[in-house]
Amino acid sequence: MFNNYGNVMMTDQFRKVEQYSPKSSPRAGGAGGRSPVVARQDSSGTLKTTIQLGKNPSIVHSGPFYLMKEPPGEGELTGATNLMAHYGLEHSYSKFSGKKVKEQLSSFLPNLPGVIDGPGHLDNSSLRSVIEKPPIGGKDLLPLTSVQLAGFRLHPGPLPEQYKHLKSVPTRKHKNKHKKHKYKEGVAPLSEQSALEASGLDTHEKKHKKQKRHEDDKERKKRKKEKKRKKQRHSPEHPGSGAASMPPQTQVF
Protein backbone atom coordinates (compact mmCIF):
# COMPACT_ATOMS: atom_id res chain seq x y z
CA MET A 1 0.00 0.00 0.00
CA PHE A 2 2.84 2.32 0.89
CA ASN A 3 4.54 1.48 -2.37
CA ASN A 4 1.43 2.40 -4.37
CA TYR A 5 1.12 5.73 -2.50
CA GLY A 6 4.79 6.49 -3.18
CA ASN A 7 4.38 5.78 -6.87
CA VAL A 8 1.39 8.13 -7.07
CA MET A 9 3.38 10.96 -5.40
CA MET A 10 6.31 10.47 -7.77
CA THR A 11 4.08 10.60 -10.84
CA ASP A 12 2.43 13.85 -9.62
CA GLN A 13 5.80 15.56 -9.07
CA PHE A 14 7.02 14.42 -12.49
CA ARG A 15 3.93 15.89 -14.12
CA LYS A 16 4.49 19.26 -12.37
CA VAL A 17 8.13 19.40 -13.47
CA GLU A 18 7.17 18.46 -17.01
CA GLN A 19 4.70 21.36 -17.17
CA TYR A 20 7.52 23.90 -16.49
CA SER A 21 10.24 22.17 -18.53
CA PRO A 22 12.00 24.16 -21.31
CA LYS A 23 10.76 21.67 -23.87
CA SER A 24 7.16 22.61 -23.22
CA SER A 25 7.95 26.36 -22.97
CA PRO A 26 6.93 28.44 -26.01
CA ARG A 27 10.31 30.20 -25.95
CA ALA A 28 12.26 26.94 -26.13
CA GLY A 29 14.04 25.88 -29.27
CA GLY A 30 17.42 26.12 -30.91
CA ALA A 31 20.75 25.85 -29.17
CA GLY A 32 20.84 26.58 -25.46
CA GLY A 33 17.10 26.32 -25.04
CA ARG A 34 16.44 29.93 -26.18
CA SER A 35 14.66 30.96 -29.32
CA PRO A 36 15.60 34.20 -31.20
CA VAL A 37 13.24 37.13 -30.87
CA VAL A 38 11.23 37.43 -34.06
CA ALA A 39 9.55 40.72 -34.87
CA ARG A 40 5.87 40.47 -35.49
CA GLN A 41 4.71 41.23 -38.97
CA ASP A 42 2.73 44.42 -39.20
CA SER A 43 -0.27 43.68 -41.37
CA SER A 44 -1.71 47.18 -41.16
CA GLY A 45 1.01 48.66 -43.38
CA THR A 46 1.77 51.60 -41.06
CA LEU A 47 5.20 52.54 -39.76
CA LYS A 48 6.15 51.34 -36.32
CA THR A 49 7.06 54.07 -33.85
CA THR A 50 8.42 54.04 -30.34
CA ILE A 51 7.84 56.91 -27.92
CA GLN A 52 10.81 57.66 -25.69
CA LEU A 53 10.00 59.51 -22.48
CA GLY A 54 12.39 61.40 -20.27
CA LYS A 55 14.03 64.78 -20.34
CA ASN A 56 13.80 65.06 -24.12
CA PRO A 57 10.81 63.01 -25.30
CA SER A 58 10.97 61.93 -28.92
CA ILE A 59 9.33 59.56 -31.37
CA VAL A 60 11.67 56.97 -32.91
CA HIS A 61 10.69 55.02 -36.01
CA SER A 62 11.45 51.36 -35.36
CA GLY A 63 9.86 49.77 -38.41
CA PRO A 64 11.64 48.53 -41.53
CA PHE A 65 10.93 51.84 -43.39
CA TYR A 66 12.07 54.31 -40.73
CA LEU A 67 14.51 56.02 -43.14
CA MET A 68 11.89 56.79 -45.74
CA LYS A 69 10.49 60.29 -45.24
CA GLU A 70 8.43 62.69 -47.22
CA PRO A 71 10.54 64.76 -49.64
CA PRO A 72 10.82 68.44 -48.68
CA GLY A 73 8.71 70.94 -50.53
CA GLU A 74 10.14 73.24 -53.12
CA GLY A 75 11.47 76.43 -51.55
CA GLU A 76 10.91 79.87 -53.00
CA LEU A 77 14.48 81.03 -52.36
CA THR A 78 17.30 79.09 -53.96
CA GLY A 79 20.91 79.81 -54.72
CA ALA A 80 19.98 81.15 -58.15
CA THR A 81 17.55 83.73 -56.75
CA ASN A 82 18.60 87.37 -56.87
CA LEU A 83 17.98 88.47 -53.30
CA MET A 84 18.35 92.16 -54.15
CA ALA A 85 15.48 91.92 -56.64
CA HIS A 86 13.48 89.56 -54.44
CA TYR A 87 13.41 91.95 -51.47
CA GLY A 88 13.27 95.11 -53.59
CA LEU A 89 16.62 96.56 -52.45
CA GLU A 90 18.05 97.50 -55.84
CA HIS A 91 17.07 101.16 -55.47
CA SER A 92 18.65 101.41 -52.01
CA TYR A 93 21.80 99.68 -53.19
CA SER A 94 22.24 102.01 -56.14
CA LYS A 95 21.52 105.00 -53.91
CA PHE A 96 24.18 104.23 -51.32
CA SER A 97 26.78 102.70 -53.63
CA GLY A 98 26.71 105.64 -56.05
CA LYS A 99 27.07 108.26 -53.32
CA LYS A 100 30.39 110.09 -53.39
CA VAL A 101 32.42 109.93 -50.21
CA LYS A 102 33.64 113.26 -48.88
CA GLU A 103 36.91 111.91 -47.46
CA GLN A 104 39.12 109.32 -49.08
CA LEU A 105 39.96 106.02 -47.44
CA SER A 106 43.62 107.00 -47.13
CA SER A 107 42.68 109.76 -44.67
CA PHE A 108 41.45 107.14 -42.20
CA LEU A 109 44.30 104.66 -42.86
CA PRO A 110 47.41 106.78 -43.43
CA ASN A 111 49.90 104.01 -42.58
CA LEU A 112 48.48 101.51 -45.09
CA PRO A 113 50.83 101.04 -48.08
CA GLY A 114 49.71 101.31 -51.67
CA VAL A 115 47.04 103.34 -53.42
CA ILE A 116 43.84 102.42 -51.59
CA ASP A 117 41.58 105.26 -52.74
CA GLY A 118 40.89 103.80 -56.18
CA PRO A 119 39.42 100.41 -57.10
CA GLY A 120 41.75 97.44 -56.93
CA HIS A 121 41.34 96.29 -60.53
CA LEU A 122 43.18 99.36 -61.82
CA ASP A 123 46.55 98.42 -60.34
CA ASN A 124 45.86 94.65 -60.13
CA SER A 125 45.80 94.73 -56.33
CA SER A 126 42.35 93.24 -55.83
CA LEU A 127 41.94 89.84 -54.23
CA ARG A 128 40.51 88.31 -57.40
CA SER A 129 43.44 89.45 -59.52
CA VAL A 130 45.90 88.05 -56.99
CA ILE A 131 44.12 84.68 -57.05
CA GLU A 132 43.81 84.52 -60.84
CA LYS A 133 47.27 85.92 -61.57
CA PRO A 134 49.55 85.22 -58.62
CA PRO A 135 52.72 87.30 -58.52
CA ILE A 136 55.80 85.67 -59.98
CA GLY A 137 58.64 85.56 -57.50
CA GLY A 138 62.22 84.82 -58.48
CA LYS A 139 63.09 83.25 -55.13
CA ASP A 140 61.36 80.89 -52.78
CA LEU A 141 60.02 82.03 -49.44
CA LEU A 142 62.75 81.69 -46.85
CA PRO A 143 62.36 81.98 -43.08
CA LEU A 144 63.67 85.13 -41.44
CA THR A 145 67.03 85.04 -39.74
CA SER A 146 67.58 85.84 -36.08
CA VAL A 147 68.86 89.31 -36.97
CA GLN A 148 65.73 90.04 -39.00
CA LEU A 149 63.46 88.69 -36.27
CA ALA A 150 65.03 91.09 -33.78
CA GLY A 151 63.07 93.91 -35.41
CA PHE A 152 59.80 92.33 -34.23
CA ARG A 153 60.84 92.00 -30.59
CA LEU A 154 60.30 94.58 -27.88
CA HIS A 155 63.52 96.19 -26.70
CA PRO A 156 64.02 98.11 -23.45
CA GLY A 157 64.58 101.82 -23.68
CA PRO A 158 62.79 104.94 -24.86
CA LEU A 159 60.67 105.08 -27.98
CA PRO A 160 62.46 106.33 -31.11
CA GLU A 161 61.80 109.91 -32.14
CA GLN A 162 60.01 109.04 -35.39
CA TYR A 163 57.36 107.07 -33.48
CA LYS A 164 56.76 109.42 -30.56
CA HIS A 165 54.31 111.64 -32.42
CA LEU A 166 52.05 108.63 -33.08
CA LYS A 167 51.47 108.02 -29.37
CA SER A 168 51.27 111.67 -28.28
CA VAL A 169 47.94 112.60 -26.72
CA PRO A 170 46.82 116.27 -26.79
CA THR A 171 46.75 117.80 -23.32
CA ARG A 172 43.39 118.85 -21.98
CA LYS A 173 42.82 122.25 -20.46
CA HIS A 174 41.28 122.06 -17.00
CA LYS A 175 38.28 124.33 -16.63
CA ASN A 176 38.26 124.29 -12.81
CA LYS A 177 41.61 125.83 -11.92
CA HIS A 178 40.86 126.06 -8.19
CA LYS A 179 40.02 122.39 -7.89
CA LYS A 180 42.32 120.57 -5.47
CA HIS A 181 43.87 117.42 -6.89
CA LYS A 182 44.30 114.42 -4.64
CA TYR A 183 47.41 112.31 -5.04
CA LYS A 184 47.90 108.72 -4.05
CA GLU A 185 50.77 109.31 -1.65
CA GLY A 186 49.55 112.71 -0.49
CA VAL A 187 52.61 114.50 -1.93
CA ALA A 188 52.29 117.15 -4.63
CA PRO A 189 54.78 117.19 -7.51
CA LEU A 190 57.88 119.38 -7.36
CA SER A 191 56.48 121.98 -9.74
CA GLU A 192 53.53 122.61 -7.42
CA GLN A 193 55.53 122.44 -4.18
CA SER A 194 57.53 125.54 -5.10
CA ALA A 195 54.34 127.43 -5.96
CA LEU A 196 52.75 126.43 -2.66
CA GLU A 197 55.78 127.53 -0.65
CA ALA A 198 55.83 130.91 -2.41
CA SER A 199 52.15 131.56 -1.73
CA GLY A 200 52.16 130.04 1.76
CA LEU A 201 52.33 133.38 3.58
CA ASP A 202 49.58 134.94 1.50
CA THR A 203 47.18 132.09 2.12
CA HIS A 204 47.90 132.19 5.86
CA GLU A 205 47.15 135.91 6.02
CA LYS A 206 43.96 135.51 4.02
CA LYS A 207 42.81 132.73 6.30
CA HIS A 208 43.58 134.81 9.39
CA LYS A 209 41.67 137.83 8.03
CA LYS A 210 38.69 135.68 7.15
CA GLN A 211 38.61 134.18 10.63
CA LYS A 212 38.91 137.63 12.24
CA ARG A 213 36.09 139.01 10.10
CA HIS A 214 33.90 136.08 11.11
CA GLU A 215 34.56 136.76 14.82
CA ASP A 216 33.78 140.48 14.39
CA ASP A 217 30.46 139.68 12.76
CA LYS A 218 29.60 137.32 15.58
CA GLU A 219 30.48 139.95 18.23
CA ARG A 220 28.45 142.62 16.41
CA LYS A 221 25.36 140.41 16.33
CA LYS A 222 25.72 139.68 20.03
CA ARG A 223 25.94 143.40 20.96
CA LYS A 224 22.93 144.16 18.79
CA LYS A 225 20.84 141.54 20.62
CA GLU A 226 21.87 142.88 24.05
CA LYS A 227 20.93 146.43 23.04
CA LYS A 228 17.54 145.28 21.78
CA ARG A 229 16.90 143.34 25.01
CA LYS A 230 17.68 146.41 27.20
CA LYS A 231 15.44 148.62 25.10
CA GLN A 232 12.50 146.23 25.53
CA ARG A 233 13.11 146.01 29.30
CA HIS A 234 12.87 149.82 29.89
CA SER A 235 9.94 150.44 27.54
CA PRO A 236 6.53 151.28 29.28
CA GLU A 237 4.64 148.89 27.03
CA HIS A 238 6.79 145.99 28.19
CA PRO A 239 4.86 143.89 30.77
CA GLY A 240 8.00 143.34 32.82
CA SER A 241 8.38 147.06 33.89
CA GLY A 242 7.75 147.87 37.63
CA ALA A 243 8.84 146.53 41.01
CA ALA A 244 6.40 143.63 41.11
CA SER A 245 7.18 142.57 37.62
CA MET A 246 8.52 139.15 36.88
CA PRO A 247 12.22 138.76 36.09
CA PRO A 248 12.96 138.96 32.40
CA GLN A 249 13.22 135.68 30.60
CA THR A 250 16.46 135.01 28.86
CA GLN A 251 16.17 134.22 25.20
CA VAL A 252 18.28 131.48 23.85
CA PHE A 253 19.54 131.98 20.33
Curated annotation (Swiss-Prot):
Classification via Pfam families: Med19 (PF10278)
InterPro entries recorded: Mediator_Med19_met
UniProt keyword annotation of Nucleus present: yes
Biased composition regions of type Low complexity, renumbered to the chain: 21-40
Annotated segments matching region Disordered: 18-49, 157-253
GO annotation terms (biological process): positive regulation of transcription by RNA polymerase II
This protein's GO CC annotations: mediator complex
Basic residues: bias regions: 165-183, 220-233
Subcellular locations according to the entry: Nucleus
Keywords noted in UniProt: Activator, Nucleus, Transcription, Transcription regulation
Gene Ontology MF, one: transcription coregulator activity
Function: Component of the Mediator complex, a coactivator involved in the regulated transcription of nearly all RNA polymerase II-dependent genes. Mediator functions as a bridge to convey information from gene-specific regulatory proteins to the basal RNA polymerase II transcription machinery. Mediator is recruited to promoters by direct interactions with regulatory proteins and serves as a scaffold for the assembly of a functional preinitiation complex with RNA polymerase II and the general transcription factors.
Subunit field text: Component of the Mediator complex.
Family affiliation: Belongs to the Mediator complex subunit 19 family.
Protein name: Mediator of RNA polymerase II transcription subunit 19
